[in-house]
Amino acid sequence: FINILGLALSLACVLIILRYIHQEVTVNHFCKDLENTYLLYCEYEDGTRTISSNEDRNNDPNFIDPLKDPSVLKSTRWINFSEDRITVGKQIYNVKTVVTDSAFLQILPYPSVSGISSLKSPNDAIITRRLAERLFKGDNPIGKTITYSTGDIITITGVIGEPPTKSFLDFDLIVSEQLQHSWSRSSYSLIQLMPGTDFKKLNVKNEKFMKLRCYMDTPTRLQFFPLKDFYFDKTIRIYDNGKSNFQRGNYNNILVLAVVTIALLIIGLFNFINIYTVMMLKRAREFGVKKVYGAGTKDVFAQIFTENFILTGMALCISWCIIEITGGMMEHVLRIPQISNTEFSAILSVGVLILLPLLTSIYPFIRYNYVSPSVSIRSVN
């Protein structure tokens, strides 16, 4: 039992870290056309980059819109409000809001839970399932009205769920950009290019710096940046107060966690193999007798592999129980969000069930298969 429990604890740690690593390296993969989806950034002559949009409020004659290129298939603009509020009845709730249009959910296809995933009128709003549960405690939110921070009454027309993979945006509420004439906030662009388009050539095409009034005539230019690379990127700045809707990652942390995972797995395997080998010492005579009665190499390996397969299966079941029990602590205490990915978890489990018994069987097999039966039979039972 100690052998199984030790392996289970090691596997639980390894699986938790592997699931987190997978979650981090698959950010935005729910976007169906991620390879052709891009953001815009504003670049200054000194190389400074800030995430931006193609909005030209001043109708500046020097402005060149990179999104007028025929290779642009679809685009949207959105505005983040990371410290927003809504009122339901007499209760005020703090929320994170995205102000945008219907194309936003076409490029980033968050799964629809109920209602419609489009903003047909200025007073339409879409909320996340997380916010729906927070506001209405299980009641159907479709058709209900809430008071937005601008004082406007907005109607909930749709509820969206969590995407299958992590998103670079964290928000609770989507409001139509048509609700207000001017939002007095910086906006950001999300673009879908035609398949096969080389964004680097587009950047070369728009490499000329512009002197725009909105940047006080400081030379700037708008460039495309792949959405798939944004999460770990450190070159593009985001000006916020530390409570941004944007989520960013650190690739160096992922590499460190990968090394830790390998170390934990090696330690767990060595522990398991050592204890299993000690147990096998007491059964050396059993293998010697079986060899005398005709057991071959395949028979010895099959027995050792089957035993390790059963032990690994038991350890894996215990490890998943540990993961489920500690899941709430990971999310609420350690602030590490866990996005459930059944497909990846199943692949991990199958991989563990096949590879671990194989790895843990090699040393005992080599040790006892090539020992002569007479030596094994003379061993102390």
Residue ranges and their predicted role:
Residues 1-2, 6, 270-311, 370-381:
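Intracellular coupling helices
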Residues 1-24, 248-285, 313, 317-318:
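Hydrophobic alpha-helical transmembrane segments of multi-pass inner-membrane transport and secretion
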Residues 12, 16-19, 308-370:
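Small-residue-rich transmembrane alpha-helices
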Residues 196, 202-205, 286-302, 338-349, ...:
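Hydrophobic alpha-helical transmembrane segments
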Residues 25-34, 170-175, 238-241, 321-348, ...:
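Short juxtamembrane loops and helix-capping segments at transmembrane helix boundaries
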